[in-house]
Amino acid sequence: MTLRKIVSGGQTGVDRAALDAALAANLPCGGWVPGDRMAEDGIIPERYPLIPLPNCGYRQRTRLNVSDSDGTAILYNETLKGGTRLTRNLCALLNRPYILISAREIPDPNVAAAAVLKFIEGSGIQVLNVSGPRASGWAGGHAFALQVMGQVIATVQERSVHGS
């Protein structure tokens, strides 16, 4: 298992859940954010080790998080829209591997985590970008992504300890 870092854009919802899961497990995390560190709930707290992009907004941040990672896990609930759709489109444009995890199709976080793990292993992902709707676009997104990514990270760490 090769995962060594989680990145995201720091927005509320799925992005922040991925960072929360990494921080809770002491896995390195980071990513690019707009220069003003703004998210829909205000300034992104400093506990998230994110790099501000001076004079840049959400689109540039999303592009760099896609291009600077080995692959992207997109967790969503209904349809791809807004920044979540942009992430998928940038993955395709930049020929970066990605996996779409629909909570509507895979409501069990353990099953979703298994799919993400298979993607990480199959694509040789060391730096994983995690993206999805902000909190206002999916009320349950943070909780779902926190469970999924928490399980992904726990499994990776357990396997690295046991050498499998």
Language model features with spans:
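Classical N-terminal secretory signal peptides
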Residues: 1-2, 164
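Divalent-metal-activated hydrolytic enzyme cores
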Residues: 157-164
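Acidic/glycine-enriched connector segments
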Residues: 2-126, 134, 144-156
